[in-house]
């Protein structure tokens, strides 16, 4: 009887040690390196969720790639919504600081993106709440760079940083 209690105590002790090591490592990884997120809505169609409401894509979000605010035109990024800080949104980077962009439905026809900001838009114009609604976005709101579609399996792919030709900045700041 005493021998079986010793085994149980050793098992519980080993489990607790593993738990108290694994949880901080997992939390740090998910917070600082990468995580996954389900994409909802039509704003990024056809790049993400091409099937509409029938299925949601699940993407890999790489926090490491945006740690120094290193983003490029065409990148698909996750950011904190400028209108609702509780919500994260996924959009494509259209313009970087210093670029002049032709807007779609914004109060100004042309906008020069201020220092420390980016211009983001959804691929499905007219179905996207983006910089055309709220203006340039502070780089401080960047959360992660979407790098791959993980789900559904038939859509496994790397997400390319491609800027639609019709959305090229009118004038680019020299890099």
Curated annotation (Swiss-Prot):
PANTHER family: MITOCHONDRIAL INNER MEMBRANE PROTEASE SUBUNIT 2 (PTHR46041:SF2)
TM helices/strands, residue ranges: 19-37
Main location: mitochondrion
Disease per record: Gilles de la Tourette syndrome: Neurologic disorder manifested particularly by motor and vocal tics and associated with behavioral abnormalities.
Function: Catalyzes the removal of transit peptides required for the targeting of proteins from the mitochondrial matrix, across the inner membrane, into the inter-membrane space. Known to process the nuclear encoded protein DIABLO.
CDD domains to which the protein is assigned, alphabetical: S26_SPase_I
Protein name: Mitochondrial inner membrane protease subunit 2
Gene name linked to the record: IMMP2L
Listed GO MF terms: endopeptidase activity; peptidase activity; serine-type endopeptidase activity
Species: Homo sapiens (Human)
Membrane in keyword set: yes
Pfam families: Peptidase_S26
Tissue note: Expressed in all tissues tested except adult liver and lung.
Family: Belongs to the peptidase S26 family. IMP2 subfamily.
Active site, UniProt feature: 43, 91
EC number per UniProt: 3.4.21.-
Known partners and oligomeric status: Heterodimer of 2 subunits, IMMPL1 and IMMPL2.
Keyword Hydrolase on entry: yes
